């Protein structure tokens, strides 16, 4: 009986595996075609027909896909750019204000050195300075002038100055103050006269944003305000003294005046249609 050698290993298998077949000989290729997996057969057929491995073919495929993607993106960008220029200049549906620029005189300099530099670069294209819009400035420079013109027109209308006269013949009437509501700052009067004795009181005939409460009546005795007339009583006759005494007993009637925005009482209204303001904020002009 033959004896096995000492270095014999019954588990050693020297055959090539199915996953990584040795494709160096024709027998291995036949074995792959007969017993290999579909992936192994596909790789073998591709290599035999094209002479290229799987990795090289995949690189070529990726290059083709990338080139196709680039061409597609370029085509789409060209279409978008053509649509943008066509909509802005062709149909003109979206109307935009024309861009305004400053005059060159605003940027002229009196310096001789700068004038020489300007002469050197005179042939170059002049740089235009764009005038920013009110939206870009977040400010309207002409708003104050328009508001002042409106106030002046209101004051002229109060005094019967018509628009047919020129501005030189229409001086703006003087006003002691512009009256505002102390609670909500609403403008109440643009043309008023200040009281001679009480500096915080004003009277006016033309008001705005004011409502008169005719249902409520305020009574005030006039005799207290006419004490100074008693100095001249000795110079008058008895008939005049009796008439004055009857007049002093008459009460003056007023109606309260409220702000239309917040209903704050700001003035009183007398029988002569004159407003007497006592609870206001005055902007002295």
UniProtKB/Swiss-Prot annotation:
Keywords, ordered alphabetically: Acetylation, Cytoplasm, Nucleus, Phosphoprotein
Sequence positions bearing N-acetylmethionine: 1
CC annotations in GO: cytoplasm; nuclear speck; nucleoplasm; nucleus
Subunit composition and interactions: Interacts with E2F1. The C-terminal half binds the N-terminal of E2F1. Also interacts with E2F2 and E2F3, but not E2F4.
Biased composition (Low complexity): 81-92
Tissue expression: Ubiquitously expressed. Highest levels in heart, placenta, skeletal muscle and pancreas. Lower levels in brain, lung and kidney. In the brain, expressed in all regions with high levels in the cerebellum and cerebral cortex. Expressed in COS1 and transformed skin fibroblasts.
Function: May play an important role in the fine-tuning of both major E2F1 activities, the regulation of the cell-cycle and the induction of apoptosis. Promotes S-phase entry, and inhibits p14(ARP) expression.
Protein name: E2F-associated phosphoprotein
Domain of life from the UniProt record: Eukaryota
Chief location of this protein within or outside the cell: cytoplasm
Residues bearing PTM Phosphothreonine: 37
Comp. bias (Basic residues): 121-130
Region (Disordered): 1-30, 48-96, 118-144
Compartments where found: Cytoplasm; Nucleus
Modified residues (Phosphoserine): 17, 109, 111
Ranges of biased composition (kind: Acidic residues): 15-30, 55-67
GO process terms (BP): negative regulation of transcription elongation by RNA polymerase II; positive regulation of cell population proliferation; positive regulation of transcription elongation by RNA polymerase II
